[in-house]
Curated annotation (Swiss-Prot):
<dbReference type="GO" id="GO:0005524">
    <property type="term" value="F:ATP binding"/>
</dbReference>
<dbReference type="InterPro" id="IPR004154">
    <property type="entry name" value="Anticodon-bd"/>
</dbReference>
<dbReference type="InterPro" id="IPR006195">
    <property type="entry name" value="aa-tRNA-synth_II"/>
</dbReference>
<dbReference type="InterPro" id="IPR041715">
    <property type="entry name" value="HisRS-like_core"/>
</dbReference>
<keyword id="KW-0067">ATP-binding</keyword>
<dbReference type="GO" id="GO:0005737">
    <property type="term" value="C:cytoplasm"/>
</dbReference>
<keyword id="KW-0030">Aminoacyl-tRNA synthetase</keyword>
<protein>
    <recommendedName>
        <fullName>Histidine--tRNA ligase</fullName>
        <ecNumber>6.1.1.21</ecNumber>
    </recommendedName>
</protein>
<dbReference type="GO" id="GO:0006427">
    <property type="term" value="P:histidyl-tRNA aminoacylation"/>
</dbReference>
<dbReference type="GO" id="GO:0140096">
    <property type="term" value="F:catalytic activity, acting on a protein"/>
</dbReference>
<dbReference type="InterPro" id="IPR033656">
    <property type="entry name" value="HisRS_anticodon"/>
</dbReference>
<dbReference type="GO" id="GO:0004821">
    <property type="term" value="F:histidine-tRNA ligase activity"/>
</dbReference>
<comment type="similarity">
    <text>Belongs to the class-II aminoacyl-tRNA synthetase family.</text>
</comment>
<dbReference type="InterPro" id="IPR036621">
    <property type="entry name" value="Anticodon-bd_dom_sf"/>
</dbReference>
<dbReference type="InterPro" id="IPR004516">
    <property type="entry name" value="HisRS/HisZ"/>
</dbReference>
<keyword id="KW-0436">Ligase</keyword>
<dbReference type="InterPro" id="IPR045864">
    <property type="entry name" value="aa-tRNA-synth_II/BPL/LPL"/>
</dbReference>
Length: 426
C-alpha cells in the first residue's frame, strides 16, 4: 500500500504556510480591533450538538458529517462548522452570566470536516476563520460584524467583493412564508431534483438554497420572503440597510438566499467575488437568536460569520495579490572544517538570542555550495568560519549584496550584533 494523505486533505508546506500565517495574523489583528477574543473548541463534538443545531434535514447532517461511535459507544462527530461548538461552549462555560461583559465577542481559527466531493477551494478537511457575537439584538451588531469582514478583505487587498443580503425575519414571518413557498412549489414538484423533493416535505426553504440547475429554474420566480416580514423584522432589516449605507458598504438584496443551516433568523449575508468567470462565496453568516436557548442557556441573541481559508487564499492567488511576507534571513554562517563546528553553533545561537534570524551549514559542504545556500535563503549578511577564525577569535562578516565587509570579534557578535548589522546594512 502506498502511504499517502487521505482524499480531500492537504499538506501545507512551509512556503504556503507563511501565507496562511499572514492571513491568520491579519484576521487576528482585525478582530482584536473590534474587541474579539479567541476561543478554541474541540475538533470533535457529541453528534447531537451538530445534528440538532445545524438541522437534521440539512445536507451537512444527512450527507457530509464524519460521525462514529467511540470505544465508550458515544456518538461523536468531527465538527463540520464552527458556530454550534462555540454556542455549546458559551452555554457550558456560563458566558451568559451577569458578571461577563456583554456582548461576548469570540473568534476561532481551525479545521472543519465534511465528506463531500473535493474540488478547488473545497476539501474534506478545510480551515475556517469565524466570529460569534452574543448578547446584542441591536441591528448595529449585524452591521458591525459585516463591516469587520469587509474591513478584513480591504486589508488583504481582495477586490470585486459584493455583499449579498437577505432577511429570514422572525419565526412567525418564516412560518407564513413557508406555507406560501409550499403552495408555489408543489405544482412543479416533479421538476425538482430528488433532494429538493425531499426538502419540500421536510424544510421547503432549503429548496431555495439548492445548487441544482432544475431547482434554480423552479425558484427563479418564487415569492420573496421579504414580502412576509412582520413589522419588527422589517424595521430590523431597514435599520441594517441604512447603517450599511452610512458606512459606504454597497450591497445587493438576494431574496433566494437562505444559507445552508437551519438556525438563522433576521439578517443573513454572503460576500461573493468572481474568479475566472465563476461566482464564489468567500464569507457567509447571519443572526441566530434562538440557538443559545436551544442549548439550554437563557434566550440570547447571536450573530456571526465563517470564511474558508483555502478559498480565501485561492482568491488572493487568482487576483494576483502579493502578500508582504518577510522571507529574508539576517545572517548565514558558512562553516569550514570540524574545528569550527562547535564555535559556529555557539555563535549562531547567540545571534538568534539577540532577535535575528540565522542559519549555518551542517553538512560539511564546499564553500561555494554554502554561499549558494546563503543566496537561496536571501541572507543579508554572510560570515565564513574556519580554523583560522576560531584561533583568532574573530571573523569577517560581509553584506551579501554590496559586498561591504567588516572584521568583528566573537565577543561583539555574541553581545552586540545589532550594531554590526546596522553598520553593514545602512
Amino acid at each position: 500500500m502506498k502511504l499517502q494523505k487521505p482524499k480531500g486533505t492537504q499538506d501545507i508546506l512551509p512556503e504556503d504556510a507563511a501565507k496562511w500565517q499572514y492571513v491568520e495574523s491579519v484576521a487576528r489583528d482585525t478582530f482584536s480591533q473590534y474587541n474579539y477574543g479567541e476561543i478554541r473548541t474541540p475538533m470533535f463534538e457529541h453528534y447531537e450538538v451538530i445534528s440538532r443545531s445545524v438541522g437534521d434535514t440539512t445536507d451537512i447532517v444527512t450527507k457530509e458529517m464524519y460521525d462514529f461511535y467511540d470505544k465508550g459507544d458515544r456518538h461523536i462527530t468531527l465538527r463540520p462548522e464552527g458556530t454550534a461548538p462555540v454556542v455549546r461552549s458559551y452555554v457550558e462555560n456560563k458566558l451568559f452570566a451577569p458578571e461577563v461583559q456583554k456582548p461576548v465577542k469570540l473568534y476561532y481559527i481551525g479545521s472543519m470536516f465534511r465528506y463531500e466531493r473535493p474540488q478547488a477551494g473545497r476539501l474534506r478537511e478545510f480551515h475556517q476563520i469565524g466570529v460569534e457575537c452574543f448578547g446584542a439584538a441591536n441591528p448595529a451588531t449585524d452591521v458591525e460584524t459585516i463591516a469587520m469582514a469587509y474591513h478584513l478583505f480591504e486589508k488583504l487587498g481582495i477586490k470585486d467583493v459584493t455583499l449579498h443580503l437577505n432577511s429570514l425575519g422572525s419565526p412567525e414571518s418564516r412560518s407564513a412564508y413557508r406555507q406560501t413557498l409550499i403552495d408555489y412549489l408543489t405544482p412543479m414538484r416533479d421538476q425538482l431534483s430528488k433532494d429538493s423533493q425531499r426538502r419540500l416535505d421536510e424544510n421547503p426553504l432549503r429548496v431555495l438554497d439548492s445548487k441544482e440547475k432544475e431547482d434554480k429554474l423552479a425558484v427563479e420566480k418564487a415569492p420573496s420572503i421579504l414580502d412576509y416580514l412582520d413589522e419588527e423584522s422589517q424595521a430590523h432589516f431597514e435599520a441594517v440597510k441604512d447603517m450599511l449605507e452610512a458606512l459606504d458598504i454597497p450591497y445587493v438584496i438576494d431574496t433566494n438566499m437562505v444559507r445552508g443551516l437551519d438556525y438563522y433568523n433576521h439578517t443573513i449575508f454572503e460576500f461573493i467575488t468572481s474568479v475566472e468567470g465563476s461566482d464564489l462565496t468567500i464569507c457567509a453568516g447571519g443572526r441566530y437568536d434562538s440557538l443559545v436557548g436551544y442549548f439550554g442557556g437563557p434566550e440570547t441573541p447571536g450573530f456571526g460569520f465563517g470564511l474558508g481559508l483555502e478559498r480565501l487564499l485561492m482568491i488572493i492567488e487568482k487576483q494576483g495579490i502579493t502578500l508582504p511576507i518577510e522571507t529574508e534571513m539576517d545572517v548565514y554562517l558558512a562553516v569550514l572544517g570540524d574545528s569550527a563546528n562547535s564555535k559556529a553553533l555557539e555563535l549562531v545561537q547567540a545571534i538568534r538570542r539577540q532577535g535575528f534570524t540565522a542559519e549555518r551549514d551542517y553538512l560539511g559542504r564546499k564553500i561555494k555550495a554554502q554561499f549558494k545556500s546563503a543566496d537561496t535563503f536571501k541572507a543579508k549578511l554572510v560570515m565564513t568560519l574556519g580554523e583560522s577564525e576560531v584561533e583568532a577569535g574573530k571573523a569577517v562578516i560581509k553584506n551579501n549584496r554590496s559586498r561591504q565587509e567588516v572584521e568583528v570579534s566573537f565577543e561583539d557578535m555574541m553581545t552586540n550584533f545589532a550594531n554590526i548589522s546596522e553598520q553593514l546594512l545602512s
